[in-house]
């Protein structure tokens, strides 16, 4: 399948100079959604994954069906104040300021083999924060898998040491 033909690009969204990669066009088409799920599952099937972790919000949409196909659970990583039980918070740097993410403290058991699945790898900040929380809880991040990678933003550079795979690459 020509997956790039299924991803809508919107120029100037959310601001001028950005070419937004809209995956709702993939999600609404059953064949494309199955293809993405099958391809991500194929990347992970031999890694003995115990659990999938997905960052808010599109990581939920991509990661949950992969977890289902692998027969493992799914753990959401959310913005602060969105998870009801005791959480671990990780604050990370943005170009101008900081942001933070949270995960339930009881969501990862020590020694669990974790795959982080998300829709997009850009600068790598969100997925690195996610990995740091998983590791703080004792999990082992064995793979990071993405539908889209924006290679020009060099997210891989801050993720050295992690296994990274993506289905589609764009420069920006």
Swiss-Prot record:
<keyword id="KW-0808">Transferase</keyword>
<dbReference type="InterPro" id="IPR005764">
    <property type="entry name" value="Ade_phspho_trans"/>
</dbReference>
<dbReference type="GO" id="GO:0003999">
    <property type="term" value="F:adenine phosphoribosyltransferase activity"/>
</dbReference>
<comment type="subunit">
    <text>Homodimer.</text>
</comment>
<keyword id="KW-0963">Cytoplasm</keyword>
<dbReference type="GO" id="GO:0044209">
    <property type="term" value="P:AMP salvage"/>
</dbReference>
<dbReference type="GO" id="GO:0006168">
    <property type="term" value="P:adenine salvage"/>
</dbReference>
<keyword id="KW-0328">Glycosyltransferase</keyword>
<keyword id="KW-0660">Purine salvage</keyword>
<dbReference type="GO" id="GO:0005737">
    <property type="term" value="C:cytoplasm"/>
</dbReference>
<dbReference type="InterPro" id="IPR000836">
    <property type="entry name" value="PRibTrfase_dom"/>
</dbReference>
<dbReference type="GO" id="GO:0002055">
    <property type="term" value="F:adenine binding"/>
</dbReference>
<comment type="function">
    <text>Catalyzes a salvage reaction resulting in the formation of AMP, that is energically less costly than de novo synthesis.</text>
</comment>
<dbReference type="InterPro" id="IPR050054">
    <property type="entry name" value="UPRTase/APRTase"/>
</dbReference>
<comment type="similarity">
    <text>Belongs to the purine/pyrimidine phosphoribosyltransferase family.</text>
</comment>
<comment type="pathway">
    <text>Purine metabolism; AMP biosynthesis via salvage pathway; AMP from adenine: step 1/1.</text>
</comment>
<dbReference type="Pfam" id="PF00156">
    <property type="entry name" value="Pribosyltran"/>
</dbReference>
<dbReference type="GO" id="GO:0006166">
    <property type="term" value="P:purine ribonucleoside salvage"/>
</dbReference>
<dbReference type="InterPro" id="IPR029057">
    <property type="entry name" value="PRTase-like"/>
</dbReference>
<dbReference type="GO" id="GO:0016208">
    <property type="term" value="F:AMP binding"/>
</dbReference>
<protein>
    <recommendedName>
        <fullName>Adenine phosphoribosyltransferase</fullName>
        <ecNumber>2.4.2.7</ecNumber>
    </recommendedName>
</protein>
């Amino acid at each position: 399948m020509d997956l790039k033909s299924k991803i809508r690009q919107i120029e100037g969204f959310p601001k001028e100079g950005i070419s937004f990669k809209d995956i709702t066009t993939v999600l609404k088409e059953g064949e494309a959604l199955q293809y993405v799920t099958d391809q991500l599952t194929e990347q992970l099937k031999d890694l003995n994954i115990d659990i999938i972790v997905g960052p808010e919000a599109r990581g939920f949409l991509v990661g949950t069906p992969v977890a289902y196909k692998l027969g493992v659970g799914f753990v959401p990583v959310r913005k602060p104040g969105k998870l009801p039980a005791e959480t671990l918070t990780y604050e990370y740097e943005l170009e101008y300021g900081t942001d933070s993410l949270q995960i339930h403290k009881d969501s990862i058991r020590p020694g669990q083999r974790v795959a982080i699945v998300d829709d997009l790898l850009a600068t790598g900040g969100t997925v690195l924060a996610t990995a740091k929380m998983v590791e703080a809880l004792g999990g082992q991040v064995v793979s990071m898998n993405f539908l889209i990678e924006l290679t020009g933003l060099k997210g891989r550079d801050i993720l050295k040491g992690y296994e990274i795979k993506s289905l589609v690459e764009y420069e920006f």
